[in-house]
Amino acid sequence: MIVLFGGQKGGTGKSTISINVSALLASQGKDILVVDGNATQGTISNWCERRESTDLPQLTYVEKSGNLYKTLDSLRDKYDHVIVDTGGQDSKEFRTAMLAADILITPIYPNQADAETLVYLSPLIEQAQEMNGELKAYVVFSKVHSNPKVKAVEDTRKLIANLDRFHVLDSKTVTRVSYSDSIAAGASAAEMGDKKAAIEIENLVKEVFS
């Protein structure tokens, strides 16, 4: 399966979530390829390089730019899962990766500004689905406030309920220091001992990959 993390807004947790998902799948014994399609930022590649010096479950990674379709399509059957990160902008990498991907996951903050970016993303997904009928588009809420009294997720769900190109996932990630600290160590938040973060990523993987 090819799973693409992408969207039109930066800083919403695409790289962080893709890293933690990749680490969990690797820990389950899956053969994982991580494709860094946002080489100018290099978050994924740098994390993978740091991980190589640890005893943690390893994965393969490559940096690719430009048209990603042929690369992804040729690698589809060579790995259990291919995880792609194209960053937070409308780019050639993002558009061509959608043509090969089985699933697009777009993390957003639970607020109106992020919800509105989906309005502009929706026609791009429609175009991609015309050529790639297998593509499913998911939204996951990222960096959610830990206070359960804050109703931002519920409010934002209502804002995007009429965008039929997207399926909003039940799983979500909460703002946690462990997510950023673990990246610096070449690890995942779960591998650094954060049990709550581990549950969040486990729920996401079950919902998407089951």
Where are these regions (language model features)?
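G-domain G4 guanine-recognition motif of GTPases
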Residues: 109, 136-151, 171-181
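Inter-motif core of Ras-like GTPase G domains
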Residues: 93-112
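Conserved C-terminal guanine-recognition region of P-loop GTPase G domains, centered on the G4
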Residues: 118-133
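Hydrophobic positions on the alpha1 helix immediately C-terminal to the Walker A/P-loop
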Residues: 17
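C-terminal boundary of histidine-terminating zinc-finger modules
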Residues: 183-198
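P-loop/Walker-type NTP enzyme "switch/lid" segment
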Residues: 2, 6-8, 12, 23-95, ...
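Beta-strand-loop-alpha "switch" segments that mediate conformational coupling across diverse proteins
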Residues: 156-187
